[in-house]
Amino acid sequence: MAKEAARVRRRERKNISSGVAHVNSTFNNTMITITDAQGNSIAWSSAGAQGFKGSRKSTPFAAQMAAEDVAKKAQEHGMRMLEVEVCGPGSGRESALRALQAAGFTITSIRDVTPIPHNGCRPRKKRRV
């Protein structure tokens, strides 16, 4: 019996002019998600999704490439203005922000939403940078 051909789900074009860019930058990777005001995901990308492997994922260049990719996807939906929420201690924070600005977005606000413990759990091994 023949298999049914896999359906290709086509992304419908949403006309959303403003949204929120969530930049999550860890020591190992940088993930960028663009959502609408309610938090529904419009587009996402990461350094690993761009083909970087291992320690190359944590570089600022990899974060820049991920930001350019997610910017292109979001602009297909009519996105023009962004609020940026940056989270995490990684090295891709600034370069992802610059790449989003260079892609033609109007950045209305930048917030650092990195969770800071008030002396909670003991952190993992001491980082040697």
UniProtKB/Swiss-Prot annotation:
Gene3D superfamilies named in the record: Ribosomal protein S11
Keywords: Ribonucleoprotein, Ribosomal protein, RNA-binding, rRNA-binding
Annotated SUPFAM superfamilies: Translational machinery components
A Gene Ontology cellular-component term: ribosome
One Pfam family it belongs to: Ribosomal_S11
Gene Ontology BP terms: translation
Keyword Membrane in annotation: no
Family: Belongs to the universal ribosomal protein uS11 family.
Subunit structure: Part of the 30S ribosomal subunit. Interacts with proteins S7 and S18. Binds to IF-3.
Its job: Located on the platform of the 30S subunit, it bridges several disparate RNA helices of the 16S rRNA. Forms part of the Shine-Dalgarno cleft in the 70S ribosome.
The protein, known as: Small ribosomal subunit protein uS11
